[in-house]
């Protein structure tokens, strides 16, 4: 048997579809397995994973994941993880807690940075400093401001999970898993239930790490173009002090039910007001327990079946659920991250009285499909969609290696073949052959694994207007009971512990300790901006932007329709219109056939919007005024020259070169002959969009807040808020009612939108493709564009009037929804305050995010996250918090930022780390399609390579004096800034800030 650096080789295979050599090693001394994926991807990834099965819902694995990265034997800093983030070129750094495992992955394109990350991560997981104070900070602790003050709980994970438990989508996922696996580790919440987290003790915490965080329970992973031998050499050194131990961490399988079950749960909701269209709705999900991940062909068939049933608007189960009118959007699909796989299907937005009708509808639809079969075009579309995604391997902003690690763990975690989920050619070929030989193959799977499967559980999640109040009262009662049981000495100890924790939090890391952290040097940084190829052509009167990039034989085509041609009353339709084009059918095909055609012949087409400010215009004359009702408003006079922003509805498609003509054919059909007159189908699209926006409030509350806040300061962001923000959610609710009461008026609006947008004079095409394939594609693209309506673009003269006429937003706003935490924002337009752009602001923001704001809002305040954002183009600056138990206190932290910067004295090493982190963010790794889209955005907004190089030079040349200079500008934000808070009505009203309140949910 081959050995190297104390590892013995277990497997050595090539995975041609990934262009990868895969070698599986076992560390002979400890038993740790190491999967080494070797290829030419410069975005190198490593991961350290452990089986971490919880036995209760204290959130022990989750809290430990936080604390592990908060100081270790070799790096005894307060927060080496965030210090590392501050000064790394990493393309990914994080840690993730799953129901049965914890993963510590990182990635970088810089080899030395990669090894630095590895060194810190390995020491963190195997030698963390698990102090009681760290558990208190990250998990939970008592807070008592005075001996006679009320007792409270604080902790980062405690508040993070209060935010998670405010999201009905999140709760449905948790409750469905727990109801499907009630007798296993999946039956409890590894993330932590806020009502149970305070049960966690320090002894349990220490014991959990000692039990599971050992090399004998570790799965080690490497991916990319680094030296495979060096992987083994380094890991051998790290593991050398350990001996093998027996770790009982196996995840037990769930014993199948003998009969189906129904379970009911509640989520916190506000009571709907009469006539507001916001009566809280139920969520229903039907879940099946499936076999373990062993037969790769069966897993592939189940993935294809899941897509065929639910993956598109044309999918028969999805269509039956939506057509029933019982709910507003579909949920479900195949999940294979648990030991036994699951399949689920259900509805969001169900009237409580209709909740029990959903499961019978699902079963009846599956029975009909099992008997009558699928439309062959639907199966063809699903096979092509799954195959295209596997071959493209487009993981978006996540490293490809990370996606492969997570896939490998589906089997590896349970002592099965880690390569099975990675090599897809054989199972795909098997399933294709089976489908060709047995047309009823998927019908048999429906029968065996769904209809005849007694392990089925329907989870009904119902709104409860009093739940949040009951939870608060229960927490208060528990605290009062615990306070009453405390002696004077106990009270003194609680206060002393809180003081000790705060003192430790405020104590800076000694320079000699900070110096231990490995870091790159300024000389390791690339001084030059890397341009993305861009060429401009005019084709048939339309602009074509082309990027010559290697795309592995995939045509990426983005078609842009100029939204500036729309009058104000039609702007909120922008995103909906894109969906309507692709999901309502054409004169020749109904939406089912159109959807199948898209799936059969392309890699997908989806709509989005590109709305952004443009360089070089004074975009906001910020004169504060008061509206007629006495509310201060931000938006007094936008300088609405057309050139101050770009706004496009983008239809983003992709296909192989041989299928590119079919991609163009579909785009031509939807632009020229989309049927917009199907009222029922359009209602479905509107309701899906509405509930999607509602579902985003809790998990993406900081983004919702930021979109609204930035809309105070620049017309581009004001338009973004109207098209994609809270304002659009309110529009969708009104539109859903108007479809019933004034369908002819709605249809007239849609036709008017089409009349304004479908015009090649205001259109652009963005193509990302290698030169050889583009030479063949370009004539077809020119023919396609030539077939579209021409004429004068209507997108300019009137748009300034449109922007000027937009209604003002209140200067200080409270957006309310049922939540246990807040999302607190404050911002201003810095150019209006006299700021002149300098690249040093990227360095300063990096330090604020990973230093001051992190310290004050997360570590001391207990929020999950804190951010600051700045647009070099618009000058808009915003502070944001995420899952924050505080409100006014967080605003005080924002207001004190200038004072912090004024008093800041940085060592050269500290300054260098912040510069490195800023460059890492600027040079974020991108796949080819993302590069092409970034280049398009830069072109449209006037971000030239020269301007980007100047900004980079200023980043690299940042000095401490730049921090002090920005303080003078940020000082003005204290008084000139606007406030937007998303949170509960009770918290917003209790803040006493006089915020103008809008009920969002």
Where are these regions (language model features)?
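M16 family metallopeptidases and their MPP-like homologs
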Residues: 43-53, 79-127, 134-143, 170-195, ...
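Non-catalytic, conformational "gating/processing" segments within enzyme and secreted inhibitor domains
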Residues: 154, 206-237, 746-781, 975
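Compositionally biased, intrinsically disordered low-complexity segments enriched in Pro/Arg/Gln/His
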Residues: 623-624
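Active-site His/Glu-centered metal-binding helix of metallohydrolases
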Residues: 60, 64-68, 577
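Hydrophobic, small-residue-rich alpha-helical packing segments that form membrane-like cores
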Residues: 143-217, 221-273, 278-280, 285
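His/Glu-based metal-binding/catalytic segments typifying zinc-dependent metallopeptidases
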Residues: 38-40, 47-49, 158, 162-166, ...
């Amino acid at each position: 048997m081959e050995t190297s650096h104390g590892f013995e080789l277990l497997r050595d295979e090539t995975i041609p579809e990934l262009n990868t050599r895969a070698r599986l090693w076992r560390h002979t001394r400890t038993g740790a397995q190491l999967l080494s994926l070797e290829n030419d991807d410069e975005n190198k990834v490593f991961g350290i994973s452990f089986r971490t099965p919880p036995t209760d819902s204290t959130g022990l694995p989750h809290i430990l994941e936080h604390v592990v990265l908060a100081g270790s034997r070799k790096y005894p800093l307060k927060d080496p993880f965030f210090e590392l983030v501050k000064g790394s070129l990493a393309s990914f750094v994080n840690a993730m807690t799953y129901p049965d495992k914890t993963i510590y992955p990182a990635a970088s394109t810089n080899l030395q940075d990669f090894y630095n990350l590895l060194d810190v991560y390995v020491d963190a997981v195997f030698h963390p400093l698990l102090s009681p104070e760290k558990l208190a900070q990250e998990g939970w602790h008592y807070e008592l401001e005075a001996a006679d003050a009320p007792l409270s709980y604080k902790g980062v994970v405690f508040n993070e999970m209060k935010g998670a438990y405010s999201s009905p989508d999140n709760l449905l996922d948790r409750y469905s898993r727990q109801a499907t696996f009630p007798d296993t580790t999946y039956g409890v919440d590894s993330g932590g239930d806020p009502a149970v987290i305070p049960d966690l003790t320090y002894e349990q915490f220490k014991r959990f790490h000692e039990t599971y965080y050992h090399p004998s329970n570790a799965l080690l992973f490497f991916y990319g173009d680094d030296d495979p031998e060096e992987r083994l050499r380094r890991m051998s050194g790290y593991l050398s002090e350990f001996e093998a131990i027996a770790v009982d961490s196996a995840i037990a399988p769930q014993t199948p039910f003998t009969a189906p079950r129904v379970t009911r749960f509640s989520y916190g909701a506000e009571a709907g007001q009469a006539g507001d269209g916001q009566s809280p709705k139920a969520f229903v999900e039907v879940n099946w327990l499936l076999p373990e991940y062993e037969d790769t062909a069966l897993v592939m068939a189940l993935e294809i079946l899941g897509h065929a049933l639910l993956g598109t608007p044309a999918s028969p189960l999805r269509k039956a659920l939506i057509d029933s009118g019982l709910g507003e959007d579909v949920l479900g699909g195949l999940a294979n991250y648990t030991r036994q796989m699951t399949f689920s299907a259900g509805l969001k937005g169900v009237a409580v009285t209709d909740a029990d009708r959903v499961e019978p509808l699902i079963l009846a639809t599956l029975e009909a499909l099992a008997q009558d079969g699928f439309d062959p075009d639907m199966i063809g579309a699903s096979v092509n969609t799954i195959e295209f995604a596997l071959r493209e391997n487009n993981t978006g902003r996540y490293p490809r290696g990370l996606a492969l690690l997570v896939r490998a763990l589906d089997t590896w975690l349970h002592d099965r073949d880690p390569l099975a989920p990675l090599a897809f050619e054989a199972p795909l070929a098997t399933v294709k052959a089976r489908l060709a030989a047995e047309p009823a193959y998927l019908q048999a799977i429906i029968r065996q694994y769904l209809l005849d499967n007694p392990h089925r559980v329907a989870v009904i999640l119902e709104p409860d207007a009093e739940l949040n109040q009951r939870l608060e009262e229960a927490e208060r009662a528990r605290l009062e009971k615990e306070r009453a049981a405390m002696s004077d000495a106990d009270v003194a100890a609680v206060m002393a512990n809180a003081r000790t924790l705060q003192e430790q939090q405020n104590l800076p890391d000694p320079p000699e300790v900070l110096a231990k952290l490995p870091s790159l040097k300024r000389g390791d940084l690339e001084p030059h901006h890397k341009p993305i190829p861009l060429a401009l052509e005019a084709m048939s009167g339309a602009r074509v932007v082309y990027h010559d990039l290697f795309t592995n034989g995939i045509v990426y085509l983005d078609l842009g329709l100029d939204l500036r041609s729309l009058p104000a009353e039609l702007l909120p339709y922008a995103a909906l219109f894109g969906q309507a084009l692709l999901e309502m059918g054409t004169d020749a095909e109904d939406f089912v056939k159109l959807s199948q055609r898209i799936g059969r012949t392309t890699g997908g087409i989806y709509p989005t919007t590109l709305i952004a400010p443009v360089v070089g215009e004074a975009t906001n004359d910020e004169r504060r005024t008061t509206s007629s009702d006495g509310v201060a408003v931000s938006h007094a006079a936008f300088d609405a020259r057309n050139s101050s922003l770009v706004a496009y509805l983008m239809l983003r498609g992709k296909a192989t070169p041989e299928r590119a003509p079919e991609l163009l054919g579909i785009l031509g059909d939807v632009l020229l002959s989309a049927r917009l007159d199907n009222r029922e189908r359009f209602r479905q699209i509107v309701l899906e969009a509405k509930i999607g926006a509602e579902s985003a409030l809790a998990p993406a509350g900081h983004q919702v807040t930021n979109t609204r806040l930035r809309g105070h300061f620049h017309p581009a962001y004001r338009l973004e808020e109207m098209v994609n923000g809270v304002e659009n959610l309110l529009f969708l609710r009104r539109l859903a009612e108007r479809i019933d009461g004034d369908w002819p008026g709605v249809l007239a609006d849609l036709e008017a939108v089409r009349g304004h947008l479908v015009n090649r004079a205001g259109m652009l095409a963005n193509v990302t493709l290698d030169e050889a394939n583009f030479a063949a594609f370009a004539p077809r693209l020119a023919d396609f564009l030539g077939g579209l309506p021409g004429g004068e673009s209507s997108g300019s003269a009137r748009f300034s009037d449109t922007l000027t006429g937009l209604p003002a937003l209140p200067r200080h706003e409270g957006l309310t929804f049922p939540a246990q935490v807040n999302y607190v924002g404050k911002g201003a337009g810095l150019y209006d305050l006299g700021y002149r752009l300098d690249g040093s602001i990227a360095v300063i923001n990096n330090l604020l995010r990973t230093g001051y704001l992190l310290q004050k809002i997360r570590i001391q305040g207990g929020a999950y996250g804190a951010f600051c954002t700045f647009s070099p183009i618009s000058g808009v600056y915003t502070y944001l918090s995420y899952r924050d138990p505080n409100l006014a206190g967080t605003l005080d932290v924002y207001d004190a930022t200038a004072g912090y910067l004024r008093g800041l004295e940085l060592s050269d090493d500290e300054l260098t780390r912040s510069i490195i982190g800023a460059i890492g963010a600027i040079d974020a790794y991108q796949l080819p399609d993302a590069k092409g889209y970034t280049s398009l955005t830069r072109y449209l907004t006037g971000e030239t390579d020269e301007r980007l190089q100047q900004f980079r030079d200023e980043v690299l040349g940042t000095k401490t004096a730049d921090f002090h200079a920005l303080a003078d500008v940020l000082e003005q934000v204290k008084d000139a800034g606007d406030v937007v808070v998303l949170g509960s009505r009770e918290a917003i009203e209790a803040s006493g800030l006089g915020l103008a309140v809008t009920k969002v949910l």
